[in-house]
Amino acid sequence: MRGRMSIGTWALVAAAMAAPTLVVAQSNAPVVAVLYFDNNSFGKDRADYDGLGKGIADLLITDMAGNPAMRVVERDRLQSILQEQDLVKSKSIDPQTAVKLGKLLGAAYLVTGGFMSDGKGTLLVTSRVISVETGAITNPLKLQSKGDDVLGLIGQLSTKLNTELKLPALPRQTGDAGARKSGAATSSSSARQAGAETTKSQKLDVKTALLYSKALDEQDSGHPKQAAELYRAVLQKFPDFGPARQNLAKVQSSGD
């Protein structure tokens, strides 16, 4: 999608930046947002993988949340901004729009990327980092899965980003406001890191990753019952899969 995105008032920007959407406790660490990955697959089965980019982003957020050198924007907040800006159905977001989106999210850096599937379980993932302030693109990466293992591929990508992405710290906040932000982030981070530890010990095939991505879509669309059914289907295959377990609990509490 190459359409223009209108930016709201400064009040909207300020509200977005102030929202408690960060998942790492260090208040002076730079804020990073992971956007949904583009489906760059081709062939007659291309459309079958359209939802996978959301699942890849969600799992990458979970994995990167354990890095104390950055604060990562929650996927729920990203989805909310995409809905506000009428970008939910966009197949891809151009760099200029991505920068504007980053400002609304209060992020200093964006991780964007795409994936290609060969239809047999092997994925090729590319990613890059965009500076919201300058629009500069850095840290281009290209990785291929070792067999039908989406989590292994995301783990590789997360490790490379965490290792190679050298982000300067922001001025440290002081006073009660900083303490309140830090406390809220610590509590959210604990849950995310628990999920990240679980994902590293398992393999997740493309078919199940697509199922998980569809569950996220149903959850975002306000269909908790359908989302719960899909999360249960994922957990039937992978009982210890933390992200699915956490999201199932969330949709159950909202009306399953």
What are these regions (language model features)?
Residues 22-24, 100-101:
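Short, flexible, glycine/charge-rich loop motifs used to bind or transfer phosphoryl groups or to couple energy/partner
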Residues 35-37, 75, 128-132:
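Generic beta-structure capping elements
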Residues 1-5:
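N-terminal secretory signal peptides that target proteins for export/translocation
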Residues 69, 75, 140-142:
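Residue-level detector of high-confidence beta-strand sites
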Residues 79-202:
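Catalytic-center loop of serine/cysteine hydrolases
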Residues 8-20:
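Bacterial N-terminal signal peptides
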Residues 24-71, 78, 83, 181-256:
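A structural "domain/chain start" motif
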Residues 73, 110, 170, 243-244:
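Secondary-structure boundary/capping residues
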